[in-house]
Amino acid sequence: MAALTRNPQFQKLQQWHREHGSELNLRHLFDTDKERFNHFSLTLNTNHGHILLDYSKNLVTEEVMHMLLDLAKSRGVEAARESMFNGEKINSTEDRAVLHVALRNRSNTPIVVDGKDVMPEVNKVLDKMKAFCQRVRSGDWKGYTGKTITDVINIGIGGSDLGPLMVTEALKPYSSGGPRVWFVSNIDGTHIAKTLACLNPESSLFIIASKTFTTQETITNAETAKDWFLLSAKDPSTVAKHFVALSTNTAKVKEFGIDPQNMFEFWDWVGGRYSLWSAIGLSIALHVGFDNFEQLLSGAHWMDQHFRTTPLEKNAPVLLAMLGIWYINCFGCETQAVLPYDQYLHRFAAYFQQGDMESNGKYITKSGARVDHQTGPIVWGEPGTNGQHAFYQLIHQGTKMIPCDFLIPVQTQHPIRKGLHHKILLANFLAQTEALMKGKSTEEARKELQAAGKSPEDLMKLLPHKVFEGNRPTNSIVFTKLTPFILGALIAMYEHKIFVQGVVWDINSFDQWGVELGKQLAKKIEPELDGSSPVTSHDSSTNGLINFIKQQREAKIQ
């Protein structure tokens, strides 16, 4: 594929931006088109609630949207989409298919990889997960002293941690009757020490999530958990009642002491950051029940069908993706804020921080050339209204344009005080996107200060600080209620957005070579930390850091 910057549609878009971009004014766009909301919004109607995507508060016109969609077509988004759904090996650097969509393919239509339909294997693992969940949640599965399981501890990192953690937090209202869940990811001993201190080995079940069963952080934490467990249980044969594996390495799993019958497999066409739909989601299913896990899959499958079959101009993931391209590649925006106004979604931004930045944080194209344009943004965010009292100042009056996605459910899980809390939350959600769009003019600020009785001197002093330029772009994503189905749909929507942007940039969104170099160097440095002899084999900075650590290791602190 030709470089993006040589694409005629992209050049046309850039030319338009150079000539007209600075003239785009959201207040003016709304004033001159009273139907702007209807022209630039999309409602997705499902049998399990509705999702409204309002993108009218973006710096776009109908002409710009046409150019963005023409660009998507010219970059082969539709063909690439079919290649993914058809099981072609679109992960070119690892020669793998990319089929998280198969994991939630509720229609069971065949999906073929290397001449073999993968759906029977997918369904076999789902059936095994279902039976296991029923045994644990019903109390049929007993620990070594005959106690039922009260706590499930997922030990994994990256995609084996972030997805299940985010979803179990988001679906906490649906966890009645399930065990508590804990997540240990960090190699920092504090993480597992703090977790184990809260647990009873007799009623704890550990899920070790590692495809290869060799991931350093995960296996180190798993061995620590096993040692802690055996301090009480004594008998190594009891490990089989308290440890299960999500892996493909039967030999290593067996060597650890886990019964291979309690190993849940997944496949090389499941990328870590897209794996919560697979056996990696076992902690989700245990916590909220398998029926709710299936609803999560169904919501994602609904969005898969929307993404695959809907024309681009009405396609939610495509619209989100191309708006992102507009801001990143024409306006020079470097970050994207994800701001869920729902406390249960407090890990949503962190989840897509990995999903987006590990997927599209690349400067090499599929053909091996270096890009001459920006690619993936820095993704960040916190739940509303907390963020309003932290970083919204910079979004409103800072020098950087930060496109924002605001998300909120219409119905709350907790209508306390007759819904007062949620009404205040909704009001803040609505106010923020309006404020970012409209801002506050000099004249409006002046009238406000005059009404407050400010003297002419104070007025002139405060006036420039009270002005808001506005014209800050936002998407509003409003959904009926945060249910397993709707959550599945929202996650899939963002997954496909990331995919579309990767296609436009001609990068492989499904490898992650950038995480390897640090791991390689860490293996070299680890033995150098032993002993007290100074290290001289690195650059002066790394040598200095290692030697300071060695000096301070035994330092006495008062």
Swiss-Prot record:
It is an enzyme of class 5 (isomerase). Its main location: cytoplasm. The modification N-acetylalanine is found at A2. The active site is at E358, H389, K519. It is found in: Cytoplasm; Secreted. Phosphorylation at Ser-185 by CK2 has been shown to decrease enzymatic activity and may contribute to secretion by a non-classical secretory pathway. It comes from the Eukaryota. D-glucose 6-phosphate binds at G159, S160, S210, K211, T212, F213, T214, T215, Q354, E358, H389, K519. The modification N6-malonyllysine is found at K454. Its EC number is 5.3.1.9. Pathway: Carbohydrate degradation; glycolysis; D-glyceraldehyde 3-phosphate and glycerone phosphate from D-glucose: step 2/4. The keyword Nucleotide-binding does not apply. GO terms for molecular function: carbohydrate derivative binding; cytokine activity; glucose-6-phosphate isomerase activity; monosaccharide binding. The modification N6-(2-hydroxyisobutyryl)lysine is found at K34. The modification N6-succinyllysine is found at K454. The modification Phosphoserine is found at S107, S185, S455. It catalyses: alpha-D-glucose 6-phosphate = beta-D-fructose 6-phosphate. One of its GO terms (biological process) is gluconeogenesis. The modification N6-acetyllysine is found at K12, K142, K454. One of its GO terms (cellular component) is extracellular space. Keywords: Acetylation, Cytokine, Cytoplasm, Gluconeogenesis, Glycolysis, Hydroxylation, Isomerase, Phosphoprotein, Secreted, Ubl conjugation. The modification Phosphothreonine is found at T109, T250. In the cytoplasm, catalyzes the conversion of glucose-6-phosphate to fructose-6-phosphate, the second step in glycolysis, and the reverse reaction during gluconeogenesis. Besides it's role as a glycolytic enzyme, also acts as a secreted cytokine: acts as an angiogenic factor (AMF) that stimulates endothelial cell motility. Acts as a neurotrophic factor, neuroleukin, for spinal and sensory neurons. It is secreted by lectin-stimulated T-cells and induces immunoglobulin secretion. Belongs to the GPI family. Homodimer in the catalytically active form, monomer in the secreted form. This is Glucose-6-phosphate isomerase. The gene is GPI.
